[in-house]
């Protein structure tokens, strides 16, 4: 359970507008992360949003149910924010092979792309993020 929590934190909590990390640096690291194996079933995660200056803006908990059919992983996410707001997102992730993934969700612009090596996953996408009564387009580079 501790390793599952650790990977959840890595995947969902650490994001920035630009990244100097390189997925190749994780090649051969253990334990090997296989996205579809990791997220099948129930997963809990916690996360945060921070501004470009590193100031904490918001925290959340997310309950995730993952199901696999053919070469598709579906993640049904239910968010609860620290201010009581609730939200949800359903990811449809295609398992492309060679440690590569692509995904869509209703608030994602275009298609997300992902690649894994060793015990890491890099997941990139553009999201229409709700802020008050409006939305802003945000680039995510999740590790």
What is each of the regions a protein language model found here?
Residues 2-10:
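Sec-dependent signal peptide recognition
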Residues 13-16:
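C-terminal motif of bacterial Sec signal peptides marking the signal peptidase cleavage site
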Residues 20-28, 81-143:
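Calycin-type beta-barrel ligand-binding domains and close structural analogs
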Residues 26-42:
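N-terminal helix-cap/turn-to-beta initiation motif at the start of protein domains
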Residues 37-61:
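Post-signal-peptide N-terminal segment of Sec-exported extracytoplasmic proteins
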Residues 43-50, 78, 124-130:
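Generic short beta-strand segments
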Residues 62-92:
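Short, well-structured hydrophobic secondary-structure segments
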């Amino acid at each position: 359970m501790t390793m599952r929590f650790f990977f959840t934190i890595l995947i969902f909590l650490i994001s920035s507008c630009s990244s100097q990390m390189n997925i190749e640096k994780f090649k051969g690291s253990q334990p090997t992360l296989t996205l579809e194996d990791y997220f099948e079933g129930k997963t809990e995660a916690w996360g945060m949003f921070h501004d470009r200056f590193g100031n904490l803006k918001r925290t959340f908990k997310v309950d995730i149910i993952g199901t696999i059919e053919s070469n598709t992983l579906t993640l049904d996410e239910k968010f609860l924010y620290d201010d009581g707001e609730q939200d949800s997102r359903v990811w449809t992730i295609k398992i492309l092979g060679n440690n590569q993934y692509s995904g869509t969700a209703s608030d994602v612009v275009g298609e997300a792309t992902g690649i894994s090596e060793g015990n890491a996953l890099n997941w990139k996408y553009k999201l229409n993020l709700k802020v008050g009564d409006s939305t802003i387009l945000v680039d995510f580079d999740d590790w």
